[in-house]
């Protein structure tokens, strides 16, 4: 079956829903697709709740994690939307998900107000550099008291300001996803209002299309008769069908291959651009030669490293971080782009220990090489829990 070509006429923006479990992230995601389908039927399919809810699953450490990808269009933009899972104790995919966002819709139930995961997700959005948030104050059909809604809105704004988002300026839109999903006209209108706020407030990202091509590997699979497909979000540059690429990181040797196909949302493209989630079909590459944590890049433009210096922030106990200090030779995991790599920390001379809540410089030696440049962000994690965030300031080896 011939695949439809993807029309690249509108600006493309990656967004997602974040927030506390059961505050209505998935219901809102479904409601957005329904309301936009009703308003612009030619542009939008409706994606039902069940389809988003039973997102493709990955099992890790006995917990099932899923991320659903849906696409929709407003009059001015094309959106790719990820619905993030809501486990407070398990943010691995939230990190890969949040790292893929040009902006996010923070869903807060008016019936509950901000909860622990609300705070955690806002913190995480700041760490992984989500540039802008819009708030959907959900379940407003269930709160009769106007003052109560105003109080919750105030709490949310204070929380955003605390994590260095412009809490006073961020749009807070009152919605009710469930009635909107069931065709209620008034609440359907509220979802359109939300999407107007997203259109206006979340900036069209400056894509890094001018830079040399690089894409972190998220997943690898084999398509019978066609070869190996590598999926991920293109971090920078453009990749065209027929170009040579290099696959590097994690292992000692790098390998070269040729891109024989690029696809996005099951549609074939001539090229993939920075910011897009694509699958690359690679000639002659075996599935076992590629793993999550590697990158696919323009040959000769990036190199894997194990040793670097970094500036980091260590989460306080209240933010869900460590309860105790750490010392020289601390060995956590360093989460770069899509994967964790263990590393050994050397503290600066004169620093005996680092307390939760501190900022510090540190030198790190990783046990596996990661493709990196100065400025690359990472999370510091222990057993799947984020305990710090940092940026590479200098590559030493």
From Swiss-Prot:
Residues 62-66 are annotated as: G2. Residues 19-26 are annotated as: G1. One of its GO terms (cellular component) is cytosol. Mg(2+) binds at residue 26. It catalyses: GTP + H2O = GDP + phosphate + H(+). Keywords: Cytoplasm, Elongation factor, GTP-binding, Hydrolase, Magnesium, Metal-binding, Nucleotide-binding, Protein biosynthesis. Residues 138-141 are annotated as: G4. Residues 83-86 are annotated as: G3. Residues 10-206 form the tr-type G domain. Its EC number is 3.6.5.3. It is found in: Cytoplasm. It is an enzyme of class 3 (hydrolase). InterPro entries: EF-Tu_GTP-bd, EF-Tu_GTPase, EFTu-like_2, EFTU_2, G_TR_CS, P-loop_NTPase, Small_GTP-bd, T_Tr_GTP-bd_dom. One of its GO terms (molecular function) is GTPase activity. Residues 176-178 are annotated as: G5. GTP binds at residues 19-26, 83-87, 138-141. Belongs to the TRAFAC class translation factor GTPase superfamily. Classic translation factor GTPase family. EF-Tu/EF-1A subfamily. GTP hydrolase that promotes the GTP-dependent binding of aminoacyl-tRNA to the A-site of ribosomes during protein biosynthesis. Monomer. HAMAP family: EF_Tu_B. PANTHER family: ELONGATION FACTOR TU, MITOCHONDRIAL, ELONGATION FACTOR TU-RELATED. This is Elongation factor Tu. The lineage of its organism: Bacteria, Bacillati, Actinomycetota, Actinomycetes, Propionibacteriales. The gene is tuf.
